[in-house]
Amino acid sequence: MENILDLWNQALAQIEKKLSKPSFETWMKSTKAHSLQGDTLTITAPNEFARDWLESRYLHLIADTIYELTGEELSVKFVIPQNQDEENFLPKPQVKKAAKEEPSDFPQSMLNPKYTFDTFVIGSGNRFAHAASLAVAEAPAKAYNPLFIYGGVGLGKTHLMHAIGHYVIDHNPSAKVVYLSSEKFTNEFINSIRDNKAVDFRNRYRNVDVLLIDDIQFLAGKEQTQEEFFHTFNTLHEESKQIVISSDRPPKEIPTLEDRLRSRFEWGLITDITPPDLETRIAILRKKAKAEGLDIPNEVMLYIANQIDSNIRELEGALIRVVAYSSLINKDINADLAAEALKDIIPSSKPKVITIKEIQRIVGQQFNIKLEDFKAKKRTKSVAFPRQIAMYLSREMTDSSLPKIGEEFGGRDHTTVIHAHEKISKLLIDDEQLQQQVKEIKELLK
């Protein structure tokens, strides 16, 4: 058979003719020929997501194309660099493998290779937490000990903890670094008592150089586990070992947490992470697209970033959803396609913002008056009454201040707004017709 690289290039040329442009560029373009052993052709995919997608969607297409070119029936297998044995296909060696030289009861570091400082996107909401984490990684137990990072789900706390672990190991391969969740700590502690191995458990976690413990809030209410962690914390701190803790809330807000633990968490530095702003969300999407080898138009990234503002996980998940949807329906990725792909998840997470001008527009339609009438000095009932309804709704359905509402209604005094609100509120108690009118207007606004 001809050179495998030439064969795969020919196959790609044929496959490109059979697929839509977005499907080919998203899934096939970044693949590479790896090896041919027996009747198995192995192809390298750039990442796990691409590998899984190729296996589920394009195996038969590739096998048929190879058969057309060679007349041979070959099975096709996809791999990613991390899964292959050849040295040139492996990622940079992780120096944490030195941990294998430790006794078998020493816990594995359990660090995610994707979570490093290089892959962390810095923004206004996480800049301080990132700087503190880097300082701790550069000088364990000398900068801030403990470092306590808190914030909502999916904002990057775990990423920073893993990044600290990687940095420490990269600069000190013999360092004993352990990452675990408080739930795992609790389960192992319970098992150690049941199996009469409490001493082994204590030795395991009190002989590390860096302890990274995630979601500490789950220790709340677990008195025995808190007792054990209290002594583990004391031992490590007294021996100048670094402790990094994460939580979804600051120590003072964790219920049923012992005061002595709470005070120790406050010994070092407490820093929070807040949801990313628009610029950071766009940067996160760009980095994710680059890492996955995806070609995403700027307008699509802007659309997703504007719609998903809760956390990073949902943001990246939305991007993958758009890419998958594009491939399924064989259409180019654009803002309209993104809106269609995300229509099921955006409404619940992105409530409509109601403005005073929108209220005036809808009320004007219902009562057949012009927009300028809301700001005019007219006092005829046909204008004044709808104006009062619009003022009432502006007070009820927006966050605007009384002066702001008055300004939007021709510069009227805030007392006029108060009077309108009180009048409509009283009328709504008994006036069923007005109740129905206001209900219909609210439905139109929503």
From Swiss-Prot:
Region span, Domain II: 72-109
InterPro entries in the record: AAA+_ATPase, Chromosome_initiator_DnaA, Chromosome_initiator_DnaA-like, Chromosome_initiator_DnaA_CS, DnaA_C, DnaA_dom, DnaA_N_dom, DnaA_N_sf
Entry's free-text remark on domains: Domain I is involved in oligomerization and binding regulators, domain II is flexibile and of varying length in different bacteria, domain III forms the AAA+ region, while domain IV binds dsDNA.
Main location as per UniProt: cytoplasm
Native source species: Bacillus velezensis (strain DSM 23117 / BGSC 10A6 / LMG 26770 / FZB42)
CDD domains cross-referenced by the UniProt entry: AAA (cd00009), Bac_DnaA_C (cd06571)
Region (Domain IV, binds dsDNA): 327-446
Keywords associated with the record: ATP-binding, Cytoplasm, DNA replication, DNA-binding, Lipid-binding, Nucleotide-binding
Name of the gene this protein is made from: dnaA
Membrane spanning stretches: none
Biological function: Plays an essential role in the initiation and regulation of chromosomal replication. ATP-DnaA binds to the origin of replication (oriC) to initiate formation of the DNA replication initiation complex once per cell cycle. Binds the DnaA box (a 9 base pair repeat at the origin) and separates the double-stranded (ds)DNA. Forms a right-handed helical filament on oriC DNA; dsDNA binds to the exterior of the filament while single-stranded (ss)DNA is stabiized in the filament's interior.
Region of interest (Domain I, interacts with DnaA modulators), ranges: 1-72
Protein name: Chromosomal replication initiator protein DnaA
GO MF terms held by the record: ATP binding; ATP hydrolysis activity; DNA replication origin binding; lipid binding
Subunit relationships: Oligomerizes as a right-handed, spiral filament on DNA at oriC.
Record-listed ATP binding positions: 154, 156-158
Biological process terms in GO annotation: DNA replication initiation; regulation of DNA replication
Compartment annotation: Cytoplasm
Region (Domain III, AAA+ region): 110-326
Similarity annotation: Belongs to the DnaA family.
GO-annotated cellular components: cytoplasm; plasma membrane
Coiled coil segments of this chain: none
